[in-house]
């Protein structure tokens, strides 16, 4: 069988950080 290639993690939208 073919070795499974690790899929890149899905990009998660980061919550907006409060600007100081």
UniProtKB/Swiss-Prot annotation:
Which keywords does UniProt give here? Antibiotic, Antimicrobial, Immunity, Innate immunity, Secreted
What does the record say about induction? By bacterial infection.
In which compartments does the protein localize?
Secreted
**What ranges does the record list as Pro residues composition bias?**
1-13
State whether keyword Secreted applies: yes
Region of interest called Disordered, as start-end residue ranges on this chain? 1-20
Q: Name one GO cellular component term.
A: extracellular space
BP GO terms, sorted: defense response to Gram-negative bacterium; innate immune response
Which family is annotated?
A: Belongs to the apidaecin family.
Reported function: Antimicrobial peptide active against many Gram-negative enterobacterial and plant-associated bacterial species. Not active against other bacterial species like H.pylori, P.mirabilis, B.pertussis or N.gonorrhoeae.
- Full protein name: Apidaecin 2+
Originating species: Pimpla disparis (Parasitic wasp)
